[in-house]
């Protein structure tokens, strides 16, 4: 319970605390636009990272959809430090487009939880994912040179974003062929998300799982992740190498853990 209270505090801080960095740290490959999200009855600010050679090339690119865009590219907009996604991808010369979706501030918990929690509420991730799949992705595929097939489409996030990214692979397996699941907050919908996975018959998604062993006062983050991986492996041979799991010694529930783990995840997922 103490762990859950600490995590919920972090979740709320994501939505309410502003960073006072004086200058933007986003690279010139990053741009933004706003799009209506009728499923959520709001508008969403979208961040777009394009590879360094995008403008000089005619090739098509795989796409990664990521949550909490405020924390991905720019220290000025982040809660407690950015992921440095743009700088890391530039250094790798990664041939991938990243689409960051800003969280809904005080609606973050609501948008990034598949089911309503009796204590904390939420439960509108289905609407949020419908926005991504039916409104945002078509816009991205029309505007940019993308490889739109599921094998070239990844979804990635941390904490509630990790939970919703996993849920997305069960809800839309025909859309998302890969996922980066960092410190997933399975606990907030534990009963429902495990039941959903148990009912799932086939699973071909490629998963990269990451969490730290010091994310709370108990080991529920690690045990939940181990349990979920076990359930997945009961439906396919581990020899297929479709999932990778990293438990970081001393890793805590914060941007540093996710920032430090991003490159290894990207490389393992094929970028």
Give the residues covered by each predicted segment:
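Non-catalytic cap/lid and distal C-terminal segments of serine-dependent acyl enzymes
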Residues: 22-271
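Bacterial Sec-dependent N-terminal signal peptides
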Residues: 1-25
């Amino acid at each position: 319970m103490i762990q859950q209270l600490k995590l919920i505090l972090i979740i709320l801080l994501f939505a309410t605390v502003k960073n006072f960095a004086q200058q933007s740290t986003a690279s010139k490959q990053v741009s933004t636009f706003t799009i209506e999200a009728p499923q959520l009855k709001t508008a969403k600010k979208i961040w777009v990272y394009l590879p360094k050679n995008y403008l000089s090339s005619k090739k098509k690119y795989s796409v990664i959809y990521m949550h909490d865009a405020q924390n991905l590219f720019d220290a000025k907009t982040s809660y407690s430090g950015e992921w440095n996604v743009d700088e890391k991808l530039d250094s790798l010369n990664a041939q991938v487009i990243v689409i960051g979706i800003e969280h809904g501030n005080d609606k973050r918990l609501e948008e990034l939880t598949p089911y309503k929690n009796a204590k904390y509420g939420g439960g509108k991730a289905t609407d949020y994912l419908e926005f991504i799949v039916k409104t945002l992705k078509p816009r991205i595929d029309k505007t940019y040179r993308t490889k739109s097939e599921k094998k070239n489409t990844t979804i990635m996030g941390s904490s509630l974003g990790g939970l919703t990214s996993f849920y997305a692979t069960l809800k839309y397996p025909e859309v998302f062929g890969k996922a980066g699941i960092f410190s997933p907050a399975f606990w907030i919908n534990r009963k429902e998300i495990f039941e959903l996975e148990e009912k799932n018959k086939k699973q071909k998604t490629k998963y990269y799982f990451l969490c730290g062993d010091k994310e709370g006062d108990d080991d529920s983050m690690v045990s939940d992740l181990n349990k979920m991986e076990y359930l997945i492996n009961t439906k396919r041979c581990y020899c297929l190498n479709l999932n990778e799991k990293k438990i970081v010694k001393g890793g805590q529930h914060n941007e540093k853990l996710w920032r430090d783990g991003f490159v290894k995840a990207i490389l393992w997922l094929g970028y």
